[in-house]
UniProtKB/Swiss-Prot annotation, chain A:
Top-rank taxon, per record: Eukaryota
Name of the featured protein: Autophagy protein 5
Disulfide bonding pattern of the chain: none
Pfam families to which the protein is assigned, alphabetical: ATG5_HBR (PF20637), ATG5_UblA (PF20638), ATG5_UblB (PF04106)
Subcellular location, record wording: Cytoplasm; Preautophagosomal structure membrane
Residues bearing PTM N-acetylmethionine: 1
Gene: ATG5
PTM per Swiss-Prot/TrEMBL: Conjugated to ATG12; which is essential for autophagy, but is not required for association with isolation membrane.
Oligomer status and interactors: Forms a conjugate with ATG12. Part of the minor complex composed of 4 sets of ATG12-ATG5 and ATG16L1 (400 kDa); this complex interacts with ATG3 leading to disruption of ATG7 interaction and promotion of ATG8-like proteins lipidation. Forms an 800-kDa complex composed of ATG12-ATG5 and ATG16L2. The ATG12-ATG5 conjugate interacts with RAB33A; this interaction is bridged by ATG16L1 and promotes ATG12-ATG5-ATG16L1 complex recruitment to phagophores. Interacts with TECPR1; the interaction is direct and does not take place when ATG16L1 is associated with the ATG5-ATG12 conjugate.
Membrane topology: Peripheral membrane protein
Length: 275, 1185
């Protein structure tokens, strides 16, 4: 019998094989070899690409180096989205490895946030965790934690330490025994087809008559266009962590098991591949 | 020694049932001795088609569905129509009582039965259905005297006893004169001769000889044996289980009948002798109080009513679980019975308690262990303060909120009531030992099975209101539907608890209550116009007349589902059944597991050579603990600890624990590689949260590293982290394999070890002390496993538990615990202390001892002082759940006050005082309870003492077969479980296997050889047990080793080992397929506490007095070495983890080591049992057909 705990492990240890190539217009002293790396799905691009940066800086002149940024098929990659989300949203239908282009020039100010240091990633990550707990427990759990617990969450993510992270994170995943779940489910729904970055609304895990809400219920409520009509053809894929959970899956369970480390369910809605 | 077929041989003119159809020949099975088989006693018969059947046993074979046994803990209630319902503490629906024909006025429930007064004013008792029948042994003695002419004959001397008598010889007792006590009993079989004489088989015919009556009898006939006698036995069985059995009333034909009007059962905590004793009290319409004599488990109906004089006219009575008995009088006062104790459960005198106010007398009382609740005539509810055994009258009344028709106090002093206006059932929330009056009334809204159909025929609010209203409150002039609606909308039964409602609304609007006579002709109701009937049955709730919580155990950890109506099951709600867990098998979950696996494959399989983005790092957790230092004087010293975890790129983890200490101002440290740790054992003693850490070396020294944390949370965090690291470094995740070795420590902690393939290998065996044990949550005394993953456990309180397939629980939270399959578990045990006294000529026995004496309050040895105030529960996990009470059940018996006498301390104690006795002691006990979590679910209905699951060699049996499981109940009944399989490890029901005495231990071997040990210390072999005949055929008596009493037996593939009460381990010699009982016992070892023989005939024990380099340990896991086919007894011991271990099961470990080439195929030699380790299994095992 497979236990639900194994899902957490699988989610955490998800890796995307990636090939980084330097943008052709970048000026190099000698030819830049592509760089191959397994990226943790749950982490952030700028947190795990020190090696990439070092690799390409070796072939470049010091004065040509400014802030690094990444792009896939013309789309600048937002570092503040988890890697797995970026991949699912933009590249899940293409062949592996994932080809990412590395830029050091012409930072797309209107598309991307600057990421001068790891502290910025930490601040962003912790604010997501806090927001999620505000939705789940009115911030009670995160506020009761000590500073070192917050630090352990971050260090766990940064050092890819599953045990260290989950020793603390499990407290964020608990809920009172008399309730059937969290107060609200922290989720964000992303679509490539719209301008809006993502959809986020208040949504409870349990309906007023005591029934558990499912993924399907959520989509019908907040993003009806994503759900195929009863008899209609399936036009979209609903993807979390590279898989397509059934619409019958209880949302509370998804939130406990398929949330990213920032405690949000990042759901990608992408057009069904035609082939 | 030879095993004797334990059978009846008919001698003399004994009426005998035709036995042709049931005498399954033992010879057929090629295992019987030369004696003719006796007819199988009891209930088994073959039907006409020759199929084997079990008579009177609830389970069918093959079982089709689980029997709907009476829930072990349920609330009983009667609605206004006299229908009886039960509501299980685990359920959320009222179940109608079986016997729907009878309508009841009153019910009073106990754990296993319910008494009631039906509308015919007769008393009935319903004994809950159980897989174990209620059976009583009747005995008679046949006495004979020798005379020179005819030898032994029935002609006795005129001064002699009767030829047929009871055991004393004083009473004439012919076999055909022994009658069944009532219509509710049936005979199990005919009379037969008992051939077991104190554990020893007698000669033919069961005769025992003596010089004269009465005298000491012996098995052997001597030259001076002038008289002889033999014992005949016959069983009768209570046949009216799960049905209302009528109790005859004691009406004097001279007088007018005086029917019963109220009744109450209780008193089960006064004494448990005989087993299941109950006090049943009743009140008649004329106000008399009656007591039912001799009600007990084995005599559920009791024997007769006896009148108890009262100073007034009684109307209602309530008997608490302990010694409280209150009666309400017609005039409104209450009578309180004084002097109820174990020697006098009827009590001795009455005292009177005045009602709270003089204008409103008491209408109704209900008593618990130390509470009394009452309802006065104005429907107010009162709580009596200060009630206990010493002061049964209490001190004063306190008015409680709400107005009730009646209240009832159940187990644990929990309270239920019936609302005065809405007739709804209320539960008093928040009743605890410290707050006995509770907090609020909460309405129970559980639905009734088939509410719709019930209401369709006769449910009418108007009629109900009129019909049962006790008082005239309003006029019945307007009884239209609108009116009834109004009276129901306002109180709003489900919306607001009674406690919140104002008094005005309690009185209700024009509530249609008329003073109808208390007739019970329900048929007239059905003639009422249809318009009065409630149109929508879902909105109407039941109207209750009576409630009884005497069988309903609500405790702090019980979560009741009575207060919400839930439509449809939530998919993630954990259902308390192992066989069906919809959440586990849900398609969405499967899909996620499957897709994640596919994703990992897709994204990683071809890219393993890629570099990881995040370099693995060392992670260190530090903290401050205390360490029990290695040198003398041993003491706790403050240390700093650091756990360094290093993870390699392959995910392998390596961890080191450093312990830094300062000695003589010098900084030092010790370190432990976590991949060498063999066990982490929590130690909750000395009010310290500590744990012991074992390595192979520390195990050999019998001196673990002991560390203590400041708080429970801190200790739990460290223990969880270290456990995770140990499992991580050994790459162990998830649930234990089906082949795992399970064990239990003396603290009830459960440990499991994965057998490595070379564990039983012929060469290079893994030494026992290198086995890694990891803890599984829960608390057990016994755990037994089978290689198909079925694991059962038994708690200290004899509760049976079945393993759910989870892991973690207890102090293992988060990642160390599985998400599902972990449930609340509890256990109960007793702490004993001794009160010691010495006699002196002036004052008699006092607590003033000699200066050399032991403490006047001590432990059993007398060495430790243990007073009532200073004695703590066994560890911080346990809490007291009772007060101190005198324990009368100590070995050797006590006088009526619980004292045991002796000439001096320490000495052997006896129950009566003699001239030479200068000291005495008595045992006090106190109940404590532990609540924890673990991957275990309760197996309800029967409490167990021992359990054994068939060990299986892989592939030896069809895996589709049910798994044989045998058990001994706490009362000593032998049981076998039907329907146990991998998918349903709990099975369906028990099948009872008759015995002539209580049993203590049972074990089943791979080939269905069932051995058992009886209370008299002898062994029994059950013949012809097979998958198609799960309960076998008959018992063969096997005498114990000379002058020893056996206490445990374990059967592997061919080997049979037994353990006696003095710790000697015995091997049964000469067991062969054709002679499964063997020939004799051979001594193997001493100092053994427990033995477990596995499916490969491997022998593991828990041994005492194992010498280590640092200390001597009790309770050490040991493996027998050198066990070979030709030497099944083995040669020596290999010592493993310990001490403090209590129980071990090797019986799931069926992995054979890969056969080495040097191994000789030993089993080919002249039909010897096959080789144990690695040998080919060409010959079938013994008893295998």
């Amino acid at each position: 019998m497979t236990d639900d705990k194994d899902v957490l492990r699988d989610v955490w240890f998800g890796r995307i094989p990636t090939c980084f190539t330097l943008y052709q217009d970048e000026i190099t002293e000698r030819e830049a070899e592509p760089y191959y790396l397994l990226l943790p799905r749950v982490s952030y691009l700028t947190l795990v690409t020190d090696k990439v940066k070092k690799h390409f800086q070796k072939v470049m002149r010091q004065e040509d180096i400014s802030e690094i940024w990444f792009e896939y098929e013309g789309t600048p990659l937002k570092w503040h989205y988890p890697i797995g989300l970026l991949f699912d949203l933009l590249a899940s239908s293409s062949a592996l490895p994932w080809n990412i282009t590395v830029h050091f020039k012409s930072f797309p100010e209107k598309d991307l946030l600057h990421c001068p240091s790891k502290d910025v990633i930490e601040a962003h990550f912790m604010s997501c965790v806090k927001e999620a707990d505000a939705l789940k427990h009115k911030s009670q759990v995160i506020n009761e934690m000590q500073k070192k617990d917050h630090k352990q969450l971050w260090m766990g993510l940064q050092n890819d330490r599953f045990d260290q992270f989950w020793a603390i994170n499990r407290k964020l995943m608990e809920y009172p025994a008399e309730e059937n779940g969290f107060r609200y489910i922290p989720f964000r729904i992303y679509q490539t087809t719209t301008e809006r970055p993502f959809i986020q609304k208040l949504f409870r895990p349990v309906s007023t008559d005591g029934q558990l809400h499912t993924l399907g219920d959520l989509l019908k409520e907040v993003c009806p266009s994503a759900v195929a009509p009863e008899d209609g053809e399936k036009k979209n894929q609903v993807m979390i962590h590279g898989i397509e959970p059934m619409l019958e899956t209880p949302l509370q369970w998804l939130s406990e098991h398929l949330s990213y480390p920032d405690n949000f369910l990042h759901i990608s809605i992408i057009p069904q591949p035609t082939d | 020694m030879k095993a004797i077929l334990y059978s009846q041989r008919n001698e003399g003119p004994v009426p005998r049932r035709p036995t042709g159809l049931c005498a399954v020949s033992v010879a057929e099975h090629r295992c019987g001795p030369a004696h003719p088989p006796r007819s199988r006693r009891g209930k088994e018969r073959r039907n006409s088609s020759g199929e084997w059947q079990e008579e009177g046993v609830r389970g069918r074979w093959p079982p089709k569905a689980a029997p709907a046994a009476m829930p072990s803990s349920a609330l009983w209630a009667v609605d206004l129509f006299g229908r009886v319902f039960t509501l299980s503490t685990a359920g959320q629906h009222w179940e109608p009582c079986r016997d729907a024909q009878l309508e009841f006025k009153r019910v009073s429930a106990a754990r296993d039965c319910c008494w009631g007064i039906a509308c015919d004013h007769q008393v009935y008792v319903l004994v809950g259905a159980s897989d174990v029948p209620i059976r009583c042994q009747e005995e008679a003695y046949e006495n004979q005297r020798w005379n020179p002419v005819g030898g032994f004959c029935e002609t006795l001397l005129p001064s002699d006893r009767w030829p047929w008598s009871d055991v004393s010889g004083l009473q004439h007792r012919p076999l055909d004169g022994v009658a069944l006590p009532s219509l509710h009993w049936e005979w199990e079989s005919d009379w037969y001769v008992d051939e077991n004489f104190g554990g020893e088989p007698t000669e033919k015919g069961g005769w025992t000889y003596a010089i004269d009556f009465p005298a000491a009898y012996t098995r052997d006939k001597k030259w001076n044996s002038c008289v002889r006698r033999r014992r005949w036995i016959r069983y009768r069985r209570y046949k009216s289980q799960d049905a209302w059995a009528k109790i005859p009333s004691e009406d004097d034909p001279q007088q007018l009948p005086d029917p019963f009007s109220d009744l109450s059962v209780g008193g089960w905590e006064v004494t448990d002798e005989p087993v299941g004793r109950l006090s049943v009290w009743a009140v008649t319409l004329q106000g008399k109080v009656w007591y039912r004599e001799n009600v007990s488990h084995h005599n559920p109906e009791g024997s007769s009513w006896s009148l108890v004089d009262t100073p007034g006219e009684a109307v209602q009575i309530s008997c608490g679980p302990h010694d409280l008995l209150w009666v309400t009088l017609w005039e409104g006062q209450a009578l309180v019975r004084e002097g109820i104790n174990r020697n006098n459960p009827k009590g001795s005198s009455w005292s009177t308690v005045e009602p709270p106010t003089s204008e409103n007398g008491i209408l109704h009382v209900s008593t618990g262990v130390c509470v009394v609740w009452a309802v006065t005539k104005d429907r107010k509810v009162w709580f009596r303060r200060g009630v206990n055994s010493h002061n049964p009258c209490g001190t004063s009344w306190i008015e409680m909120f709400g107005e009730m028709m009646m209240v009832n106090v159940g187990l644990n002093d929990q309270v239920w009531g019936i609302g005065c206006v809405d007739r709804a059932l209320y539960f008093r929330q928040g009743v605890t030992q410290s707050e006995l009056s509770g907090k609020t009334w909460k309405v129970i809204v559980a639905g009734r099975e088939g509410d719709r159909s019930l209401s369709g025929s006769s449910f009418s609010l108007h009629s109900a209101g009129c019909f049962f209203g006790n008082e005239v409150r309003g006029s019945a002039e307007s009884c239209g539907p609108g009116d009834t609606d109004a009276s129901w909308e306002v109180p709003g039964p489900a919306s607001s608890p009674a406690g919140l409602r104002g008094k005005e609304s309690w009185k209700g609007p024009s509530h249609a209550t008329a003073n109808f006579p208390e007739a019970t002709d329900l048929s007239s109701l059905r003639l009422l116009p249809l318009g009065l009937e409630e149109p929508d049955s879902a909105d109407c709730h039941a109207l209750w007349a009576w409630v009884s919580g005497g069988g309903c155990a609500v405790e702090a950890h019980t979560t009741l589902k009575w207060f919400t109506t839930q439509s449809g099951l939530c998919p993630s709600v954990q259902t308390l059944s192992l066989s069906i867990t919809p959440a586990q098998t849900a398609a969405w979950r499967k899909q996620i597991f499957q897709q994640l696996t596919e994703r990992t494959k897709r994204e990683l399989e071809n890219f393993q050579h890629y570099e990881q983005a995040v370099e693995q790092s060392v992670w260190v957790k530090t903290g401050a603990l205390q360490w029990w230092c290695d040198w003398k004087p041993h003491k706790w010293m403050d240390v700093h600890v650091a756990l360094e975890q290093l993870t390699g790129h392959d995910g392998a983890q390596d961890s080191i624990l450093f312990i830094y200490y300062v000695v003589h101002e010098e900084k030092k440290y010790i370190h432990v590689f976590l991949n060498e740790v063999t066990a982490l054992v929590p130690v909750f003693s000395e009010a310290k949260h500590s744990f012991a850490l074992y390595t192979p070396e520390r195990t050999r020294q019998r001196w673990p590293v002991r560390l203590a944390a400041a708080t429970e949370q801190d200790m739990s965090d460290w223990l969880t982290l270290l456990n995770l690291s140990c499992c991580e470094s050994r790459r162990m995740h998830g649930r234990p394999s089906p082949q795992a070795i399970w064990s239990v420590t003396c603290k009830g902690d459960i440990f499991v070890s994965e057998p490595s393939p070379d564990l039983e290998g012929p060469e290079r065996r893994l030494p026992c002390d290198q086995m890694f044990w990891r803890q599984i949550g829960g608390h057990l005394r016994v755990v037994e496993a089978n290689s198909r993953g079925v694991v059962w456990g038994i708690g200290y309180d004899h509760t049976a538990w079945v393993y759910t397939g989870g892991y973690g629980g207890g102090c293992f939270q988060g990642l160390a615990s599985s998400t599902s399959n972990v449930f609340t578990q509890w256990d109960v045990k007793f702490v004993h202390i001794y009160e010691n006294q010495r006699w002196n000529p002036v004052t008699g026995y006092t607590s003033r001892g000699l200066p050399t004496d032991r403490y006047m309050w001590s432990d059993a040895t007398g060495l430790q002082e243990c007073t009532k105030a200073s004695t703590k529960p066994p560890s911080l996990q346990w809490t007291w759940v009772s007060d101190w009470f005198v324990d009368f059940s100590v070995p050797g018996g006590t006088d009526p006050e619980g004292w045991q006498y002796a000439s001096d301390f320490p000495a052997s104690y006896h129950k009566y005082k003699t001239m030479k006795d200068f000291v005495r002691r008595r045992c006090w006990a106190r109940k404590c309870k532990l609540v924890t979590t673990g991957p275990w679910l309760e197996v309800t209905s029967v409490a167990l003492r021992d359990v054994s699951i068939i060990p299986e060699s892989p592939g030896a049996h069809g895996s589709g077969l049910n798994i044989a499981l045998w058990a001994i109940s706490d009362k000593g009944d032998v049981l076998c479980r039907l329907g146990v399989s991998e998918l349903n490890p709990e099975g369906f029901c028990w099948m009872h296997v008759g015995t002539d005495q209580p049993f203590t231990s049972v074990s089943i071997g791979t080939c269905y050889q069932v051995w058992a040990v009886a209370r008299d210390g002898s062994a029994f072999y059950r013949s012809s047990v097979s998958p198609s005949r799960p309960n076998g055929d008959c018992w063969y008596h096997i005498p114990p080793p000379p002058k020893q009493r056996l206490k445990q037996v374990s059967v592997g593939h061919t080997s049979v080992f037994a353990l006696d009460e003095n710790g000697n381990l015995w091997y049964r010699q000469g067991v062969t397929p054709s002679h499964p009982q063997g020939d004799s016992w051979e001594h193997v070892s001493n100092n053994v506490r427990h033995v477990s023989v596995g499916p490969l005939d491997q022998v593991w024990v828990i041994a005492d007095k194992v010498q280590g380099s640092h200390s001597l340990s009790r309770g050490t896991v040991c493996r027998r070495t050198g066990v070979q086919s030709l030497e099944p007894k083995g040669q020596g011991w290999d010592y493993g983890i310990g001490g403090g271990w209590d129980h071990l099961s090797i019986r799931a470990s069926a992995t054979r080591a890969p056969r080495s080439s040097s191994q000789k195929p030993a089993s080919k030699q002249n039909g010897q049992p096959p080789s144990v380790a690695g040998g080919p299994w060409q010959t079938p095992g013994p008893v295998c057909c």
